[in-house]
Amino acid sequence: MKPENLRRMEADRALVERYLEGCFLYDGEPQQTLFKAMRYSLLAGGKRLRPILTLNFARACGGTAEQALPFAAAVEMVHTYSLIHDDLPAMDNDDLRRGKPTSHKVFGEDLAILAGDGLLNAAAELMSRAALQMADSRGIRAMEIIMRHAGVTGMIAGQTRDVLSEGETPREDLVAYIHSHKTADLP
């Protein structure tokens, strides 16, 4: 990769990170505890490739990083919600994510579910607010694409197939379906 592309990617990662750090800072109960659980997973690190790709796609389509930043952050929120739910005992029952205890290990299953739900709803709210500020329908279209890929024919379909295939002998077509929907379907 060219040095200027690496610099752009790192600058975009830092931009997204700063934006995410400004989310969910309410200090009253009950939101404070919920926001703490949401931030725990959202700010647990990661490469932020999905939001970086979102910013670059927007630029390629004539938009700016500033216009796309709420959508990029929303993509990361949706991704994080899916990881929180995937780690739950009823799903993959993972104890660690990115080298740290998973949300349900730190906050309990109930708050982990609510944190995931909260992130998904916050993503939709964030995109809705941003779309309302745009003079054309690009924001609504972006929101529709993101939520469709996160929904019942996208990531949720992959997770459902993963759950239903528990105990089956892995087949190439099954693994490909799960990966293309559960892992790769989110823009």
Label the model's feature ranges.
Residues 1-18:
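N-terminal leader/targeting segments and the immediately adjacent pre-domain N-terminus
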